[in-house]
């Protein structure tokens, strides 16, 4: 896959627009994702639900694991690195992954700085809860943004919150005067140039996916109707009773997000979705969405 300039990196991200990107931990799961119509897979050692359950320090996947998944599919392969861990990113770039996720799902490596993504030829995706976080990551070189949600919970409420906040903040700046945009830039700690561009476009200058808590076809369609350009599914597929069925159904629901009849049809007889977590049950220090700044 050709990467390099900012235009090429953003162009690759746009190629996934309207699709579903699935977390996978082995070649078998990667094949299920590809057969279901996923536009890409995310290679990692454990899905977020298992990372949450096992505790400890979560790191980049073993290069052998990433290579195994890359060899198993023809669709693009992404992989996660810890926030601020630019050497993990260098390793993944050397392996030839198609995109890197600087992810709050893994244990942050740097409490002050995110990775300078402009130094890499491979594109990056980063999570955000609001417009300020999104524009700061884009300023660092992110080619794609996704909601953080609360990973590994099967609970869509935080992803909905983050998407609504971001879309509301974008609408608020669209009709502001230049001096007001200066004020917004200072308030959200984001570059004025990106604030201006977002106000003019009426959307982020890069694709904006939903992630964190998507567990059903209806969840995926909900996020698309709220303005997402596509959907990441972490634990929702392979923690369900019927991974193949849920994978296909979520792809269909994402593609036909504005057609309730299609969503109803693909949702029939899927079996039990992953067991979800109530957000209030998660202690503050255990909330992955709060990682990063």
Swiss-Prot record:
Query: Sorted alphabetically, which CDD domains does this protein's record hold?
Result: pdxS
List the Pfam families: SOR_SNZ
Q: Which organism is it from?
A: Methanothermobacter thermautotrophicus (strain ATCC 29096 / DSM 1053 / JCM 10044 / NBRC 100330 / Delta H)
- Supply the name of the protein: Pyridoxal 5'-phosphate synthase subunit PdxS
Q: Where does D-glyceraldehyde 3-phosphate bind?
A: 164
**Molecular functions per Gene Ontology:** pyridoxal 5'-phosphate synthase (glutamine hydrolysing) activity
Keywords, comma-separated and alphabetical:
Lyase, Pyridoxal phosphate, Schiff base
- For the ligand (D-ribose 5-phosphate), the binding residues are 23, 152, 213, 234-235
List, from the UniProt record, the residues annotated as the active site of this protein: 80
Q: Which gene encodes it?
A: pdxS
């Amino acid at each position: 896959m050709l990467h390099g300039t900012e235009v090429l990196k953003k162009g690759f991200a746009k190629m996934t627009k309207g699709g579903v990107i699935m977390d996978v931990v082995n070649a078998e799961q990667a094949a299920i994702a590809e057969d279901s119509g996923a536009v890409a897979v995310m290679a990692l050692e454990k899905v977020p639900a298992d990372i949450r359950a096992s505790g400890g320090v979560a790191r980049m996947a073993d290069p052998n694991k990433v290579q195994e998944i890359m060899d198993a599919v023809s669709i693009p392969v992404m992989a996660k690195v810890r926030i601020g861990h630019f050497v993990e990113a260098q390793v993944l770039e050397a392996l030839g992954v198609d995109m890197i996720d600087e992810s709050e799902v893994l244990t942050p490596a740097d409490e002050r700085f995110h990775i300078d993504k402009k130094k890499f030829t491979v594109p990056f995706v980063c999570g955000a809860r609001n417009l300020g976080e999104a524009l700061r990551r884009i300023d660092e070189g992110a080619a794609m943004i996704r909601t953080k949600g609360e990973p590994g919970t099967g609970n869509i409420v935080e992803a909905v919150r983050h998407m609504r906040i971001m879309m509301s903040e974008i609408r608020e700046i669209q009709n502001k005067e230049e001096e007001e945009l200066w004020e917004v830039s200072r308030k959200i700690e984001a570059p004025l140039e990106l604030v201006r561009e977002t106000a003019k476009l009426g959307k982020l200058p890069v694709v904006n996916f939903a992630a964190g808590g998507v567990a059903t076809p209806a969840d995926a369609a909900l996020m698309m109707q709220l303005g997402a350009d596509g959907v990441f599914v972490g634990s929702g597929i392979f923690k369900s009773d019927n991974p193949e069925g849920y994978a296909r159904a979520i792809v269909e629901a994402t593609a036909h997000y504005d057609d309730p009849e299609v969503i109803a049809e693909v949702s029939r007889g899927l079996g039990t979705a992953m067991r979800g977590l109530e957000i209030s049950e998660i202690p503050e220090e255990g909330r992955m969405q709060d990682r990063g700044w």
